């Protein structure tokens, strides 16, 4: 069990909260997280790249010139891959890049990745009530009060983010908002700092504890 210091949105200390998640063994954690990230990135690929082979390119049915007597290399079609406008040899065709990983492994990888970033956590009291209308500057100032630089990539994890918070964060290039029950390994590892709402900690333990 790890105890985290909770801060108010103004940066002052507010108390403490505990988080206890089962993680992978140190000997296998790196491989597990690596496979989880590969799966996530592979499954995002559309796999729609497609080229035409020699037989699929339009035209080229007639032999361009006679076989012998021209002094040139023999050609059977103007759509040969050797000529501009011809077919493509071993080009890509639509395919699925999806990788499989069972649910227990995915959950274990996520918990391990999350707990490995514990030193980069900024646990805050839920600050949705402090914003009555979308205001990007308030998010910027709030992150600054938490000791986060403007150049750092930030992942904000909240239990049930309101539309006001979503709109306030939407314009910030280096800040990403995600719900506590929709976490993924890549975003956790890609961020420099993780700002987690106090109720999100409870939600994470409820959803990902097993």
From Swiss-Prot:
Q: Where is this region: Disordered?
A: 44-94
Which keywords does the record carry? Ribonucleoprotein, Ribosomal protein, RNA-binding, rRNA-binding
Here the segments flagged for biased composition (Basic residues) are: 60-71
Q: What is the superkingdom listed in this entry's lineage?
A: Bacteria
GO aspect biological process, one term: translation
What's one GO-annotated cellular component?
Answer: ribonucleoprotein complex
Composition-biased stretches (Polar residues): 44-54
Tell me the GO molecular function terms. Answer: rRNA binding; structural constituent of ribosome
The UniProt entry, under SUPFAM superfamilies, shows: Ribosomal protein L4 (SSF52166)
Provide the family line: Belongs to the universal ribosomal protein uL4 family.
This chain's function reads: One of the primary rRNA binding proteins, this protein initially binds near the 5'-end of the 23S rRNA. It is important during the early stages of 50S assembly. It makes multiple contacts with different domains of the 23S rRNA in the assembled 50S subunit and ribosome.
- Which proteins does it associate with, and in what oligomeric form? Part of the 50S ribosomal subunit.
The identity of this protein, by name, is Large ribosomal subunit protein uL4
Its organism's taxonomic lineage begins at: Bacteria, Bacillati, Cyanobacteriota, Cyanophyceae, Synechococcales
């Amino acid at each position: 069990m790890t105890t985290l210091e909770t801060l108010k949105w103004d940066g002052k200390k507010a108390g403490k909260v505990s988080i206890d998640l089962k993680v992978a063994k140190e000997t296998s954690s790196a491989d597990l997280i690596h496979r989880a990230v590969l799966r996530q990135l592979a499954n995002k690929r559309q796999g729609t790249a497609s080229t035409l082979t020699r037989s699929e390119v339009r035209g080229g049915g007639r032999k361009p010139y006679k076989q012998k007597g021209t002094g040139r290399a023999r050609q059977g079609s103007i759509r040969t891959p050797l000529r501009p406008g011809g077919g493509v040899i071993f080009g890509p065709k639509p395919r699925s890049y999806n990788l499989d990983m069972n649910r227990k492994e995915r959950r274990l990888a996520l918990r391990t990745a999350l707990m490995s970033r514990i030193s980069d956590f900024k646990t805050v009291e839920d600050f949705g009530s402090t914003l009555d209308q979308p205001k990007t500057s308030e998010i910027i100032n709030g992150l600054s009060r938490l000791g986060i630089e403007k150049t750092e990539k930030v992942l904000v994890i909240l239990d049930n983010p309101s539309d006001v918070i979503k709109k306030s964060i939407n314009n910030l290039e280096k800040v990403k908002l995600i719900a506590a029950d929709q976490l993924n390994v890549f975003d956790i590892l890609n961020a420099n700092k993780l700002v987690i709402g106090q109720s999100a900690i409870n939600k994470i333990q409820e959803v990902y504890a097993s």
